[in-house]
């Protein structure tokens, strides 16, 4: 059986990257929430 996690830097950036988050309203809310929590890393 093939494992579920097949790492790829491009896919990671496209799905969870900063630009992907900024593209949607929900994503912007995610970033805002992470900022208020004081997260060191906001996105992948």
UniProtKB/Swiss-Prot annotation:
A GO BP annotation: translation
Entry's family note: Belongs to the bacterial ribosomal protein bL34 family.
Single GO cellular component term: ribonucleoprotein complex
GO molecular function, one term: structural constituent of ribosome
Name of the protein this chain belongs to: Large ribosomal subunit protein bL34
Family annotation (Pfam families): Ribosomal_L34 (PF00468)
Alphabetized HAMAP family for the sequence: Ribosomal_bL34
Keywords from the named record: Ribonucleoprotein, Ribosomal protein
Coiled-coil ranges from the UniProt annotation: none
Source taxon at top rank: Bacteria
């Amino acid at each position: 059986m093939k494992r579920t996690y097949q790492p790829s830097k491009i896919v990671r950036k496209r799905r969870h990257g900063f630009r992907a988050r900024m593209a949607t309203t929900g994503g912007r809310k995610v970033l805002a929430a992470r900022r208020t929590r004081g997260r060191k890393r906001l996105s992948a």
